[in-house]
Amino acid sequence: MARPGQAGPALGEFLTALHDRWRSMSRDELVAVLGTHAERLPVRERQAFLDIFVGPGADAAPTAPGRRVGVDLMARIAAFKARVAAGEYAGDDDGGYHWDGYGWADEESAAWVPDAESLFADIGDVFVAGDLVAARTAYESLLEPFLRGGDDDWPLELWQLESTDVPEMVARYVRCVYETTPADQRVDAVLRAFLELPEERALSLAEVSATRVDALPDLDAFLPGWIVGLLTASGFPSVRDEVRLLAEAAAMHGGADALADLARRPGRHQGGIGVVWIDALTAGGCLSDARAAAEELIDLPGVEAVQRAKAADRLAHLLGHEGDTSAAVTARRRAWTTHPTRARLLALAATCQGAGVLVQTLAAEADALELAWTSSGRTGPDRLGCELLLLAGRLDAAIAALTDASPLGWHHAVHPGPVVLPFLWAAATGTAPLAGDGHLGQLYADIDLDPAALPRPEDWSGWDGTPSRPPDHSQRPEPAEPTLTGLLADAIGRLRDDAGAREEWLVIAGAVSDARIAAIVTGKHRGAYARAAALAYAHAEALAKMGKQRQAHDHLAAVRARYPRHSAFRGEFDAAATSSTLRARAT
């Protein structure tokens, strides 16, 4: 199986699958397949393909193209390192990489890259030929400039290599270390290799094993010491890396029982291993054991909050599968209060809906939230807290958080603006707009964008940073049910039918919108001009929905006239008219 980012299977997996397919084919079938493949080869690849086969009168297969081993290879590696140390590649370290406003772009390879690529390819030939001692010696020598630096002690970067499959190369090197180290020293040597290599964070024993057809030898004897070594190692900068390797080793060594032992052993790995333990039991169909494991992990001393919340998530799912909805609600509430996230709020709502206790549960959680921030002396809830308050019908508290917040910085995940403002417009009009209903509908639909789940801040609906490509709404995946916008629409339906309150919400929304537009335009945040224009049109659309057509057009005219010297903003403002349910009057 190909690893993430890899173009195909590892060598061992590939050769095993290839041999399996060969065995079922006759000579004629094999010749036909090779002939068909040869017919489709590009011109530049034909001679290399032909050279694979022994020509008439030849005694043996030729040496693989470009292979130069032994003293010659080590001499070329030494010469390469000397050039690096002497600074012959100085000035080309960045390889032409530059920031183009959207990401890092490269114009050409660094000068050292072709030389390094050739050397790594030749070492790969040595590895494939089975001389792991020579391959290890060569790898260790060539990797020195990448690990300890060259000119001015700046290390070369493996990620700049283009034709070399770096993850496979690293796995091959570790395989060499494993097989050429005496058994009593193997754990320390392999662990040192994992910790030193730049790519060790994405490496696993399974990937090391897959570099050859034969599995890693003596793995059963290696694993107990490997687990102890991982537990006592101090070089892992990330708990996730440690947990990943421990989970793999435990699964290989003793399955769920080994995972349970690790989860009960104090250390920073406990929570992550505990979650893996629960998942392994669930995948194996041992649901009652998985439930017991989740209950144990939730209250296990020393486990961090995020992992206890994950255990509560899994417990709620298992309880729901058993039909115990009341206990499932309790588990969802435990997960939410332990480590609040948008996903947990939605999961809580979904479980409560199924149990028929949504309104009272939201009210209880909102009470707890308001008590917590009042007793702590904080100024008010963040975006996630406001989402809970809106679902519970606590508009006054959410509005206070919105009006107290800065008119800028909406790209921060804690800012209440991207959720509370569209909700206020929807509440003022009495109904949630459809996604295609002008700017108002789009801003409301954007509520479902969870900042914690977006890879780039530029994709956030409230982004007011440097100019960037606008989010492509058509490429967004459909959010899972229940959606926050759907739940908020239900909450709007539960609000009191008070015309005075609706008018007040509209006035507040207009004031917040105007303040944000002013902050963006006067601050010359050009990347957010289009979003500022969208706010103006959204407010006008809300006015129109409430039967205030004249006020809607007057509002648009006033906003445009307010910034006579900001031609870039006025251009975005005029362009926004094409996406609105309204049209600005001629000025």
Please name every model-derived segment.
Residues 1-587:
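Eukaryote-biased, non-catalytic alpha-solenoid scaffold regions
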